[in-house]
Amino acid sequence: MTEIAAIHAREILDSRGNPTVEADVLLADGTLGRAAVPSGASTGEHEAVELRDGDKSHYLGKGVLKAVDNIESVIAPELEGMDAANQRLLDATMIALDGTPNKGRLGANAILAVSMAAARASANSLKIPLYRYLGGANASILPTPMMNILNGGAHADNNVDFQEFMVMPVGAERFSEALRWGAEIFHTLKGVLKKKGYNTAVGDEGGFAPSLSSNTEAIEVILEAIELAGYKAGEDVAIALDPAASEFYDKEKGKYIFKKSDKSEKTSEEMAQYWESWTRQYPIISIEDGFAEDDWQGWRYFTELVGSRIQLVGDDLFVTNTERLQRGIEEGIANSILIKVNQIGTVSETFEAIELGRRYGYTSIISHRSGETEDTFIADLAVATGAGQIKTGSASRTDRIAKYNQLLRIEEQLGQTGEFLGLEAVNFGE
């Protein structure tokens, strides 16, 4: 019986040493479901609210005791006795309890922890894997990894304006092979950077953050590493970018300012042309947040320019939110949506965003946050939804590797029924 008997929550630490929320959902049959929520460094303005205490004497104001208390004193009394397997009703009940458009009263971190834990408890009670519980009998697609191996922007102290440079092993035949290729390139890149005298410490997501001289040098060292590892750039392995352009957009000037590199300023049209020239010069197949979250005009121009030949992903633009995605669909903006469960705050709404995108030909990429935990929910979510792509960091740091290892286990469980789409998972706007 999947009836909820008790809900408990606690304050734990994420991969950056900041507090986050973990929830336990205990069912009447004694089954436990546990989930921990992640948090982001570069967050979109339109994301659901992550409730922090603001008490400087407790974790420098970043505590989440209010969110924990909201679970135990507000959410638990309402949900206890309900069926954990009725995900939509549980999530709708918590949304109604909160009563704000952005989950600002109870906190998306409180609501999401319970939403995920309930799903896991139900799967455990039914003795089926989480991906099977969430995705049904046909869930069999393993995602192509987008591995963030080099960092700039808000994730690094260097002269690189763009936040993430990723490799996608699109030519691999199965997930485990793609992961191996990515790991080999990551280790080869370390050697390339060392040889050039650069620091090889890793950032929040396990990628290197050396003091490179420019944005182009970042791409060039990756291309060198791909080749040295024995792979062909553009054929075996492609490049994906997440510039996180909101971080270097000046709203007052209405311009993109390369503050960290050459201090140049670009209008939206010039920025679109800049990206277009990069896609001609380098084997780039996906650009996420190439424009600021509210620069709809820039996004439109960009989509018209290159949307028919590369994947254009909205993260800060859409924030896993169906209303913003609907606007993007109507205006012909982007062709892919990044899915971060904590941007919207419930499992049900996450599925709704993926389904809406799919209806209009938008791909989905399941994503981690820079502040992660050992929770592997998103690995199962990627398979459950058949998203075909996952973004969960580099080939280092246990908080990232945990997701990859879970996908290796799922690949093993699926056996011959498992599918790996490689390049086919990526939307070229066709």
UniProtKB/Swiss-Prot annotation:
Keywords: Cytoplasm, Glycolysis, Lyase, Magnesium, Metal-binding, Secreted. GO terms for biological process: glycolytic process. One of its GO terms (cellular component) is cell surface. It is found in: Cytoplasm; Secreted; Cell surface. Pfam families: Enolase_C, Enolase_N. Its EC number is 4.2.1.11. It catalyses: (2R)-2-phosphoglycerate = phosphoenolpyruvate + H2O. (2R)-2-phosphoglycerate binds at Q163, K340, R369, S370, K391. Binds a second Mg(2+) ion via substrate during catalysis. Mg(2+) binds at D242, E288, D315. The active site is at E205, K340. Its main location: cytoplasm. Catalyzes the reversible conversion of 2-phosphoglycerate (2-PG) into phosphoenolpyruvate (PEP). It is essential for the degradation of carbohydrates via glycolysis. This is Enolase. It comes from Acidobacterium capsulatum (strain ATCC 51196 / DSM 11244 / BCRC 80197 / JCM 7670 / NBRC 15755 / NCIMB 13165 / 161). The gene is eno.
